[in-house]
């Protein structure tokens, strides 16, 4: 299982993402911390920052941007993915400073990508929902879905494959085409419980327990 960081290091990254966004929205400046944990300057993992609006017990995506295969180092990737999530996600308007008390920050640290080279028909058997994220690439098209997306949507492996193909603007069965390259990866995910509050590490395997057959049927309706 891919877990390179302690909860203290993960909390540092989530707090860094929030403080980076707050400073950027207030001043337009990107501040690099003076004395970060040294391993964050050495490691070079992929990083995604996700921002969600909280309304009661509901969460709505507000922005998600990142680097599948790293950017300089984990520290820089966190800083610049946070800026991207708040202000550069083309699906949403830029985050406003007054929204900060109402949004949750989540930072996902990605393992190196692994290319699947088996018979594509076997891919659903190789993908573990709650463990794997997916990347598809074909020519100029590419799409990525974080592992938590499949858990939150209660998808099975085939549904996960369909949606990552659609994310890349490819046919839903693109994964069956040998011209398509399919990659799997794992992620260590740190998240705020409340806006600016306590930070914890998500356990996606445990979260899949809510995806009963009944829940799946309700999601399909």
UniProtKB/Swiss-Prot annotation:
Residues 8-201 form the AMMECR1 domain. It holds the Pfam family AMMECR1. PROSITE patterns: AMMECR1. This is Protein Pisl_1005.
């Amino acid at each position: 299982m891919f877990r390179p960081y302690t909860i203290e290091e993960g909390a540092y990254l989530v707090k860094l993402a929030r403080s980076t966004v707050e400073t950027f929205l207030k001043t337009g400046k990107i501040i690099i911390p003076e004395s970060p944990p040294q391993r964050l300057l050495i490691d070079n993992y992929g990083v995604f920052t996700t921002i969600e609006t909280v309304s009661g017990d509901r969460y709505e995506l507000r922005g998600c941007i990142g680097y599948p295969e790293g950017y300089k180092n984990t520290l820089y990737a966190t800083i610049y993915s946070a800026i991207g999530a708040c202000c550069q996600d083309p699906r949403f308007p830029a985050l406003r400073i007054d929204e900060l008390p109402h949004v949750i920050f989540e930072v996902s640290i990605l393992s190196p990508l692994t290319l699947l080279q088996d018979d594509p028909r076997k891919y659903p058997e190789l993908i573990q929902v709650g463990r794997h994220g997916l990347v598809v690439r074909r020519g100029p098209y590419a799409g990525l879905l974080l592992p938590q997306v499949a858990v939150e949507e209660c998808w099975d492996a085939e549904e996960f494959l369909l949606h990552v193909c659609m994310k890349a603007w490819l046919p839903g069965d693109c994964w069956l085409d040998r011209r398509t390259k399919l990659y799997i990866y794992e992620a260590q995910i740190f998240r705020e419980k409340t806006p600016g509050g306590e930070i914890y590490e998500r356990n996606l395997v445990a979260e899949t327990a809510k995806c009963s057959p009944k829940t799946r049927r309700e999601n399909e309706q």
